[in-house]
Amino acid sequence: KLGDYIKTVNESAGNDYEIELSVDETDQPTTLAEHYIIADQCLKGGMKLVSLAPRFIGDFEKGIDFIGDLDALHASLKDHAAVADVLGPYKLSLHSGSDKVSMYGLLANATQGRFHVKTAGTSYLEALRVVARHDPSAFREIIDFSRGRYETDKATYHVSATLADAPLTSEADDATL
């Protein structure tokens, strides 16, 4: 129904639109059967699917490189790309893609260039670096607020970092921040 709504609203307004479907925020990798069923049903329903972000094998923590077996990942990427070719073609999307340098070439190869990498985290970190350099007190406020929210907010992400991994702002000089 959401796909129908998006289509109706955009077409009636004369707007072009596209859908990127994300199913990557799960504990288990997306199976090929799940990928097929999800994409097939969306496409049969008239959804303008441009890319799909499955949950791939391995670990995709925010801000660090891929953790896992690269050969197994490459084989899995090829399999998911084959599903996308049969049903679409549409792009495979890598969410939590920031800093996954070891797998970018594998993704490009497996998809023959039909891929999307979501790197919003890197842009956010670069923005924080600018704040730290130009307004250290504002950066300290952001860090203190973030530390206060970390235990709650990390529940929605796959991360292994702990608060003990980072110094308190009161213990760090501006250059360290």
Language model: regions and residue ranges:
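Active-site capping/gating regions of soluble enzymes
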Residues: 1-14, 27-177
